[in-house]
Swiss-Prot record:
Phenotype of gene-disrupted mutants: Mutant is defective in the incorporation of O-acetyl groups into both ECA(CYC) and ECA(PG).
InterPro entries reported for this sequence: Acyl_transf_3_dom, WecH
Homology family: Belongs to the acyltransferase 3 family.
GO cellular component: plasma membrane
Membrane-topology annotation of the record: Multi-pass membrane protein
TM spans (from-to): 13-33, 46-66, 79-99, 114-134, 139-159, 169-189, 203-223, 235-255, 267-287, 300-320
Role according to the record: Responsible for the incorporation of O-acetyl groups into the enterobacterial common antigen (ECA) trisaccharide repeat units. Catalyzes the acetylation of both cyclic ECA (ECA(CYC)) and phosphoglyceride-linked ECA (ECA(PG)).
A GO term, aspect molecular function: O-acetyltransferase activity
Tree of life domain: Bacteria
Subcellular location: Cell inner membrane
EC annotation from Swiss-Prot or TrEMBL: 2.3.1.-
Protein name as it appears in the record: O-acetyltransferase WecH
Top-level taxonomy: Bacteria, Pseudomonadati, Pseudomonadota, Gammaproteobacteria, Enterobacterales
Periplasmic topological intervals: 34-45, 100-113, 160-168, 224-234, 288-299
Length: 331
């Protein structure tokens, strides 16, 4: 049995909370003309800070499976059963409580997830599939820094184009295409950074500063896009974008350095139920929003309410499923 890795547990708990926060604040950031500028800005900052959640999940999986140990048949079974189980729950919810075309959802089951958040199960399967082929080596800090700068920023196709007198100098075209490339890269970086000796106080401070700066740039960039487009655009929110890339690496390093001696009680609970929380949370948020069980006249209270109610309900449902699912196949 593998020894417990405290920082992984804590990081998984943080990432899970961030996913819930993303979907809690989505209505506000995508409906800028229906809310006050202050409300939109608060929701935007919260959403910007939470964009690292998905990259962190890929990094955690990479740390666990891109080393001596790769994904085993039981891991593929689990991801397949999770996709089937939570798709079935989503289909039941769609049939009973929405006007979404269930027949169309079934027809496109292998091309498009039944409910938007279930895309992650398809994407994480790729990490499992390539894990027998990848064993990340120990890499020096300077080499890793250069690699991250080039692939994550300079040659990242999601980098906002920069031009001087019509000459485009960023991003450089290294023919990197597709989000899956970055999902696998996140996994490899999770393993590489996880193996490195990062226990330096100065590095922790630099990581914290980088994360805060990255969140500021993401939020201000999104505000700028809103102002010149007249509507919301996710240019700076992209999971494979350069600023989210930097923030994910910074937060991983910070948590690894500061939360590695024990599992924080609350985060440990969330971590143990992260799969169930992820599977249920989007349905609960949709139900609360569409049934008007919200506090939109008090936006800040509404964000707190939706977040807490969703987390509590998802956690309870996960606990119920775990009582039945003794082998933890879908919970």
């Amino acid at each position: 049995m593998q020894p417990k890795i405290y920082w992984i547990d804590n990081l998984r708990g943080i990432a899970c909370l961030m996913v819930v926060m993303i979907h809690t604040t989505t209505w506000y950031v995508t409906n800028a003309h229906s809310v006050s500028p202050v409300t939109w800005d608060i929701a935007n900052v919260l959403n910007s800070a939470s964009r690292v959640s998905v990259p962190l999940f890929f990094m955690i999986s990479g740390y666990l499976f891109f080393g001596e140990r790769s994904a085993q048949p039981r891991h593929f079974l689990r991801i397949g059963l999770c996709l089937i189980f939570y798709s079935a729950i989503a289909l039941l919810y769609i049939a009973l409580f929405t006007s979404i075309n269930m027949e169309l959802a079934l027809k496109n089951l292998l091309q498009k997830p039944v409910f938007y958040h279930l895309w992650f199960f398809f994407a994480i399967a790729v990490i499992y599939l390539v894990s027998p082929l990848i064993q990340v080596k120990n890499v020096g800090g300077k080499m890793l820094l250069v690699l991250m700068a080039v692939i994550g920023i300079i040659a990242n196709p999601n980098t906002v184009p920069q031009k001087i007198d019509g000459f485009e100098w960023l991003p450089i075209n290294l023919y990197i295409n597709g989000d899956t490339f970055y999902y696998i890269l996140y996994g490899m970086l999770g393993r590489a950074i996880g193996m490195m000796d990062t226990q330096h106080k100065a590095l922790s401070w630099v990581s914290a500063a980088l994360f805060a700066t990255g969140v500021f740039i993401i939020s201000r960039g999104t505000l700028y896009e809103l102002q010149w487009r007249g509507n919301f655009a996710d240019t700076w929110y992209l999971y494979c974008g350069p600023m989210v890339f930097i923030c994910a690496i910074a937060l991983l390093t910070l948590v690894k350095n500061t939360l590695d001696t024990r599992t924080i009680r609350g985060l440990g609970l969330i971590s143990r139920h992260s799969l169930g929380i992820y599977g249920f949370h989007a349905l609960i948020i949709h139900a609360l929003r569409t049934r008007g069980i919200e506090l939109k006249n008090w936006p800040i209270l509404d964000i707190i309410w939706i977040f807490c109610a969703t987390l509590a309900a998802s956690l309870l449902l996960s606990m119920l499923v775990q009582r039945i699912d003794r082998n933890r196949l879908v919970s």
